[in-house]
Amino acid sequence: MTSKKTTPMMKQWHQCKEKAGESLLLFRMGDFYEAFYDDAIVLSQNLDITLTQRQGIPMSGIPVSTINGYIDRLVSKGFKVAVAEQLDEAQDNKGKSEPLSRELQRFITPGTLLSSSLLPEKANNYIVSINRVGALFGLACLDFSTGSFLLQEYDNMKDLVDEICRLAPTEILSCDKFYKKHADIIEQIQQHLKLTLSTYADWAFEHQFATQKLSLHFHVSSLDGFGLKGLVPAINSAGALLSYLQDKLLLPVEHISIPKTQGNQKHLLIDTASQVNLELLTPIHDPQGKSSLLHVMERTSTPMGGRLLRNTLVNPFYDQKEILLRQDAVEFLLDRSELRKNLKSLLSQVRDLERLTTKITTSLAGPKDIGMLRDSLNASIRVCEVLSPLPLPKFFQGRFTLPIGLTSLSELLSRALLGELPLRISEGNIFCDNHHPDLQRLRYTKEHSKEWLWQYQETIRQQTGVKKLKVCYSQALGYYIEVSSDFAPLLPKEFIRRQSRLHAERFTTEKLQEFQDDMLNISDKLQTLETQLFKDLCAQILQQREEILSLSQVIADIDYILSLSDLAAEYNYCRPIVDTSDSLSISGGIHPVAQTLLDKGTFIPNDIKMHSTRTRMILITGPNMAGKSTYIRQIALLVIMAQMGSFIPAKSAHIGMIDKIFTRIGAGDNLSKGMSTFMVEMAETANILHNATDRSLVILDEVGRGTSTYDGLAIAQSVVEYLLFTEGKKAKTLFATHYKELTDLENHCPHVENFHASVKENGGQPVFLYEILKGHSQKSFGIHVAKLAGFPLCVISRAQQILRQLEGPEATSKQPQEKELQLTLF
């Protein structure tokens, strides 16, 4: 609240704070950005900055020179930051009673980073906007750092949540009405992601406003030409997001691309639970570790290629044509090791073309950024020149003919810019001397002023014949030419008299005045000239913006294929047959992550052979630690790799495309929703039963173990039967279980086959062979595993005694009655 005693400067602060709202306001005051009141306390607590007071008002400050690092720290903690800039310089305001002009100029939020150490180089940084119209959810997804804009719609909450979790945004935008009505959606998302929730006005999500906002931005009268016809919820989300960025956060939006929809593209769907369970992006128990599939496959050299690999890993293809195109391209490079080496070297010189273009579009680029663009364009063009003469596979054909404007731009940047460039324009030394005649003259004048004066003095001595003529300098006159009074009449008419002395006359010339002007203002002139030249160069770059972004996509695709071919070459992967058949046959398959973590040749390969008309359900029994879980995960990972267009670690493989992968592996309590481990297990299994199809792959590990023996067995068998006999749900299923009773199903159903994780006994001790063989397991060796885990020997001994009782002659059934089991414990 302002008061009568509030200073004019603090009135400015209150006006800015009102606009900043919930954001933490950094208010420029000379060489510091200051925070006041509660903002000052928050700043002090989170950045370890001294908290002081001015007239009883809490305040803390950050030096202007270090502002970006502090903003990054605040944003990483989930804060939104508003920055009020000083519009006048202090010297310009000297003698005036009113304060310097200040206004709120920008906001920084987790989802709107443009230039920050927080931006992950090889991952997108998304902000998403969601709303609902009728039964449909609309999702708009924007990577503000690249301008990539995606729209999608969903008819159920689960698919929406899965997609948001796949995208892993850092910020979500919606209106109060949506948040209140769909708190469950936000809760589900927050279980998997750390993100910031942002709220915007309800009216911004109205269709008329959203349509108008998008149409104005993209300069069209209709959005139908973008393939958005009928996508009302998605358009509403997109229009609100654009307005939020431009109108509320005051951010530049010129770089935001025309929104794309998934359209007819088909992808293998991997739900959130499966992404986590299969450790596609992040290891479950070691988030910084090396046991994710992404870590194994990551061989890319460019940020764009890295982002493409990451996105494709969680969104593989369900389109044979797209898969085969990439397989052919991988094979093409796989057979050419020298070409791969050459391309790798060139790609390592390519920086982030997408984000560099965004920085230029939004006027945030500095000279070093333009230098990186120059080097990246040169290397990218060289990549195209290397590949274009070759007999290319279809995936690459027609993609390396570069527009004349792009090659001309590359040549211009190489001619215009110096080799080493500064971070800021104000540091100067950006352009080559010959880029502009005034630049060369000013620099030469500055660097050779004494030499120039001496040469000029000698020149006019020779021209006039006055050998004692001198070029001098004084504070009052500046530079002047002095001759004795006797020789003054000999000087040409263009010499301009400045001063008469007792025995001497002082003159100047236009050339000397020009030199003086240059010397007096040379630094300012140089900075002004280079600033203007820099702006002109950025404008020329932006004329080729779309061509640069197209080249960026080409480089990303090459980098992606090269990464897959390097991986295949390093581990001797095979090319799988991927088609529309119902086959899932892999010979000598190896877990791609385990292969890299273990010594070479120590991982035991295993096979699988499934078909919808023959075996489509495999029951796997065997002791813990024998490799059951590794095996079933392995099959899912190999399918994912194959449908990315990658080769896979196996001797051979024939994979009929899978439309969805579901996993029910492990569990933990979900305390935030009051769900026990067993409830989480049942919820995930229910999702599988509702959403699996005949072309899905289902991975089940120990379903039913979280309850009583009979309950668990009943649930497990019912799930198996449902997936075996329900039309439209006959998915290929790998079921690891300790329920030996389930293995009897093989005798009654031709589509079920038993396998087991093999174990050899040596002196009464099990030796795990890690082979998956036909037939069911005879023993579980659970007590041995307990012993390895460090159980007290007395507990192990008692367990062995109880086991002998249960397995003795008095046990007349395969499964003991629960009452009998209880009696043996006392």
Curated annotation (Swiss-Prot):
Residues binding ATP: 622-629
Single Gene Ontology BP annotation: mismatch repair
Keyword DNA-binding appears in the UniProt entry: yes
Keyword DNA damage: yes
CDD domains listed in its UniProt record: ABC_MutS1
UniProt entry keywords in alphabetical sequence: ATP-binding, DNA damage, DNA repair, DNA-binding, Nucleotide-binding
A cellular component term, taken from the record's GO annotations: cytosol
Single GO term (MF): ATP binding
PANTHER family: DNA MISMATCH REPAIR PROTEIN MSH1, MITOCHONDRIAL, DNA MISMATCH REPAIR PROTEIN MUTS FAMILY MEMBER
Family: Belongs to the DNA mismatch repair MutS family.
Function: This protein is involved in the repair of mismatches in DNA. It is possible that it carries out the mismatch recognition step. This protein has a weak ATPase activity.
Protein name: DNA mismatch repair protein MutS
Gene: mutS
